[in-house]
């Protein structure tokens, strides 16, 4: 039977990779809904190719433009817009599988709606777990949803773990690998002069600009540690980070008998996406087979927390509990946006997050409203902190 997909964030890099896999297996997968924020032209092209029942965009103006283009092309795809429309297509009876690939906090509500509707969720939006881990996992359990990780690291861990609970599997720890990003060997004193274009040039992966900056600061890896905690039920002291510049080993699981299982593959997001789409089966992802003889050398090193303070801040937030992770994520989103807009220096991203967490009145959230409130408070605090920072130099901003 065909799986019917709602693809949240179809115009991003994860969306592109997902649709590439779908194209290879039309007998297995059909598209119910595609969503984008404002990239209407690309969404129209996707709709004309995959003929979804529904297309969702962020605002009325984009919706009107998309609908006009679709009607002119003879498409019957219905067009909706706004936050509620995202929730609606995520819980719709027209789909059984939701690929959650919206970047940032905007992906929380539709991902949670999919969980509460008992959907099969392919989770690429790590913020859903970073912001509301306990709430999200409770919804998955209580409503019979199936949660499959799409992030390459978490998908690798999932493949290396037994199907029963972590506490019964003899697991000693999980090891999340990281490339180290574009600045792994760059002199720390020069990081203040990093430009957005430099930060977005990842050595191994093709990603969107926001996640590329997160990789450059290693905040992305910190968020992945938090996500791993919720996905696999392990405390922070049993989750290690290991720098692996070649991005061939995507993560490892260490067992109490001394065994270590690892998942290897070329750095291509189509592999974990295809695994999650077809699970428990396997399908062709269009990815070349790994040639270890050609690679020849795999190297590893411990992370430098002084070079990457965002990684340390994320682990601190996980250990603090409460709404600290939600505040961390919100402050980081504001800071990264400011950096990409050339309003702050690269090094000010960590400074902003640190300032927000230092001023946080932490508390245990009683529900989603508390999480959303903490997110809003952190965004205001981050914005206020950034407004007080000196503007970057003219040379850098040019």
Swiss-Prot record:
Catalytic activity, as annotated: 2-C-methyl-D-erythritol 4-phosphate + NADP(+) = 1-deoxy-D-xylulose 5-phosphate + NADPH + H(+)
Highest taxon above the source species: Bacteria
Pathway stated in the Swiss-Prot or TrEMBL entry: Isoprenoid biosynthesis; isopentenyl diphosphate biosynthesis via DXP pathway; isopentenyl diphosphate from 1-deoxy-D-xylulose 5-phosphate: step 1/6
Binding of NADPH, residues: 11-14, 38-39, 125, 127, 208
EC assignment: 1.1.1.267
GO annotation (BP), single: isopentenyl diphosphate biosynthetic process, methylerythritol 4-phosphate pathway involved in terpenoid biosynthetic process
InterPro entries, per the entry: DXP_reductoisomerase, DXP_reductoisomerase_C, DXP_reductoisomerase_N, DXPR_C, DXPR_C_sf, NAD(P)-bd_dom_sf
Binding site for Mn(2+): 151, 153, 224
Keyword tags: Isoprene biosynthesis, Manganese, Metal-binding, NADP, Oxidoreductase
GO molecular function, one term: NADPH binding
Keyword Oxidoreductase set for record: yes
Protein residues bound to 1-deoxy-D-xylulose 5-phosphate: 126, 152-153, 179, 202, 215, 220-221, 224
Signal peptide positions (record): none
Cofactors, names only: Mg(2+); Mn(2+)
Role this protein plays: Catalyzes the NADPH-dependent rearrangement and reduction of 1-deoxy-D-xylulose-5-phosphate (DXP) to 2-C-methyl-D-erythritol 4-phosphate (MEP).
PANTHER family: 1-DEOXY-D-XYLULOSE 5-PHOSPHATE REDUCTOISOMERASE, 1-DEOXY-D-XYLULOSE 5-PHOSPHATE REDUCTOISOMERASE, CHLOROPLASTIC
Entry similarity comment: Belongs to the DXR family.
This protein's name: 1-deoxy-D-xylulose 5-phosphate reductoisomerase
Species the sequence originates in: Burkholderia thailandensis (strain ATCC 700388 / DSM 13276 / CCUG 48851 / CIP 106301 / E264)
């Amino acid at each position: 039977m065909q799986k019917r997909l709602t693809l949240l964030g179809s115009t991003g890099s994860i969306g592109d990779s997902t649709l590439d896999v779908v194209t290879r297996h039309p007998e297995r997968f059909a598209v119910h809904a595609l969503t984008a924020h404002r990239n209407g032209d690309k969404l129209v092209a996707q709709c004309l190719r995959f003929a979804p029942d529904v297309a969702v965009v962020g605002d009325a103006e984009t919706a009107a433009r998309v609908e006009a283009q679709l009607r002119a092309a003879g498409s019957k795809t219905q067009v909706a817009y706004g936050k509620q429309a995202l929730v609606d297509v995520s819980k719709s009876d027209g789909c059984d599988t939701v690929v959650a690939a919206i970047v940032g906090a905007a992906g929380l509500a539709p991902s949670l709606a999919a969980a509460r509707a008992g959907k099969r969720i392919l989770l690429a939006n790590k913020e859903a777990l970073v912001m509301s881990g306990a709430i999200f996992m409770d919804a998955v359990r209580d409503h019979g949803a199936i949660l499959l990780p799409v992030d390459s690291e978490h998908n690798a861990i999932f493949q290396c773990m037994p199907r029963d609970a972590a506490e019964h599997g003899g697991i000693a720890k999980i090891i999340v690998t990281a490339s180290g990003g574009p600045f792994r060997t760059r002199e720390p004193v020069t990081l203040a002069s990093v430009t957005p274009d430099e930060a977005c040039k990842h050595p191994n992966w093709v990603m969107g600009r926001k996640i590329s900056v997160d990789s450059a600061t290693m905040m992305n890896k910190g968020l992945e540690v938090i996500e791993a905690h919720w996905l696999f039920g392990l405390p922070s002291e049993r989750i290690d980070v290991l720098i692996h510049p070649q991005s061939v080993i995507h993560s490892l699981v260490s067992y109490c008998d001394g065994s270590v299982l690892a998942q290897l593959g070329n750095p291509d997001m189509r592999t974990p996406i295809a695994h999650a789409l077809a699970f428990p089966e396997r399908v062709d992802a269009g990815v070349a087979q790994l040639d270890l003889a050609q690679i020849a050398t795999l190297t590893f090193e411990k992370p430098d927390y002084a070079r990457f303070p965002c990684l340390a801040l994320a682990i601190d937030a996980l250990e603090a509990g409460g709404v600290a992770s939600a505040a961390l994520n919100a402050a980081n989103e504001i800071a990264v946006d400011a950096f990409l807009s050339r309003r702050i220096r690269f090094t000010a991203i960590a400074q902003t997050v640190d300032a927000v967490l230092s001023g946080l009145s932490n508390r245990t959230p009683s529900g989603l409203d508390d999480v959303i409130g903490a997110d809003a408070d952190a965004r205001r605090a981050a914005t206020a902190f950034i407004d007080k920072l000196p503007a970057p130099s003219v040379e850098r901003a040019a």
